[in-house]
Design a protein with these regions (language model features):
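Secretory/extracellular carbohydrate-interaction modules
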Residues: 2-69, 155
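Surface-exposed coil/turn segments at beta-strand junctions on protein surfaces, enriched
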Residues: 8, 21-23, 80-84, 99, ...
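Beta-strand-rich interaction surfaces with strong enrichment in secreted/lumenal proteins
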Residues: 14-20, 74-81, 123-126, 137-138
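Short tryptophan-centered beta-strand motifs in secreted/extracellular beta-sheet-rich domains
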Residues: 28-30, 84-98, 102-108
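Surface-exposed loop/edge segments in extracytoplasmic proteins
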Residues: 52-54, 73-77, 113-121
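Short, aromatic/His-centered strand-loop micro-motif at the edge of beta-sheets
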Residues: 67-90
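Flexible glycan-contacting loops in extracellular carbohydrate-active proteins
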Residues: 115-147
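Extracellular beta-strand elements of beta-rich domains used
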Residues: 149-153
């Protein structure tokens, strides 16, 4: 089954899913598909640790990915998204030491290609690891549907 967000009405739409897991590292995997319409492009986001937890947001119009925590931007990475193809995401959050810092890893690649060996992001941040549920958001700025598939949560 594929979870599809229609292109209208325009707005931001999200869902929390999976078990509330604390004190263990989490990996969220999923794939998504969407298209642009003229110069308008959709945006997607995924989170670990609930709505205010660690979030990645793909901003195709700005050609970047943004990692944020509790609405504070942590890192911006240049990224060129191509529409009309499935994309695969691996997003990991692992506590370090006494959970006072967190190691974050991220991969994003076209599904028709092999998974890259290197992580797009592999960095330690001074944010407290709390764990929690996972989240997905869709922002259909292009007025075209956004599809999510192959949702998988792994605990470490």
């Amino acid at each position: 089954k594929i979870l599809t967000l229609p292109g209208t009405p325009m707005g931001d739409f999200g869902l929390l899913f999976g078990p509330r897991i604390r004190e263990k590292g989490l990996e969220l995997r999923f794939s998504f598909f969407s298209t642009n319409k003229g110069r308008r492009m959709p945006s997607i986001a995924a989170g670990i640790g609930g709505i205010r937890g660690l979030q990645l947001r793909l901003n195709p119009a700005a050609r970047n990915l943004v990692l944020s925590y509790d609405e504070t931007n942590l890192k911006k990475v240049p990224f060129l998204w191509v529409d009309a193809q499935w994309w695969e995401v691996r997003f990991q959050m692992t506590p370090e030491g006494s959970c006072s810092s967190t190691n974050v890893k991220l991969k994003l690649w076209p599904l028709k290609e092999n998974e890259p060996r290197a992580w797009l992001v592999n960095e330690k941040f001074d944010i407290e690891y709390k764990g929690g549920k996972c989240a997905l958001w869709g922002f259909p700025y292009a007025s075209t549907p956004i599809a999510f598939d192959n949702l998988l949560i792994l605990s470490r």
